[in-house]
Amino acid sequence: ILIPENVKVKAEIIAKEPGIIAGIEEAKILLESLGIKAEAKIKDGQKTSCGKTILKLEGNARTILAVERTLLNLISRMSGIATQTNRIVEKVKAAGYRTKIACTRKTAPGLEYFDKKAVWLGGGDTHRLHLDDMILIKDNHIAIIGSIKEAVKIAKEKASFSKKIEAEVSSVDEAIEAARAGADIIMLDNFSPKQVREAVKKLEEEGIRDKVLVEVSGRINEENVLEFASIGVDIISLGILTHSVKALDLSLEVKQVTA
């Protein structure tokens, strides 16, 4: 109603706070599919500062305004994920630990690819992109099958040799059972730092620590991540990277009416 049909404008997407930018590649594809010229002023995975232009747009004013919110939502969410991931990754590195920081499958419906790509751009590990990327034996599988040992046995018999097997455990005894059964990765789910130490120590005493990767997950955040990294686990997976993300503050501003 307000904007004449053939008005053309130049606009810019501007960062309102510092962070790691993600979603530029997807934004360009979206804009170009709508006939809007898009010029990236920063690459995915790079840091931006407050007030910096990250993307320039040129084209039909109605189209740009119609896609504005979708565009900002996508880049803001992905950049927020990348920024938080990078902050945690760098915190662990700065403390001298080599623990991998990974996300989980607790992503927004329909946005798993974008969420996980943002984690990767922030320096984190994507864990599984799809259910069939790896065999993850969880508590409900064990409840149905009867035991971790039997679940691992079935997985090893039926799966390709190329598939790693991870077992989610809820006690030190289950961790030992899973490792002895031949699981490649042991996930200590909702363990306290004290319980993680006990599990790692027990695996060492049994002579099987070097045969498995140890992942911890559940109730871990930016504040307590170093408590877990200091124990010597291999992977820390955090649901907060994607399910509780704070979007990076961005805005779209029309800079010039060209026609």
Language-model segment annotations:
Residues 1-181, 185, 197-202, 213-215, ...:
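Acidic/glycine-rich phosphate/pyrophosphate-binding loops and surrounding catalytic core
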Residues 190, 218, 240:
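Short secondary-structure boundary segments
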Residues 205-212, 255-259:
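Short acidic, glycine/proline-enriched helix-loop-strand junctions
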Residues 244-258:
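Short, basic/aromatic-enriched C-terminal tail that caps enzymatic domains
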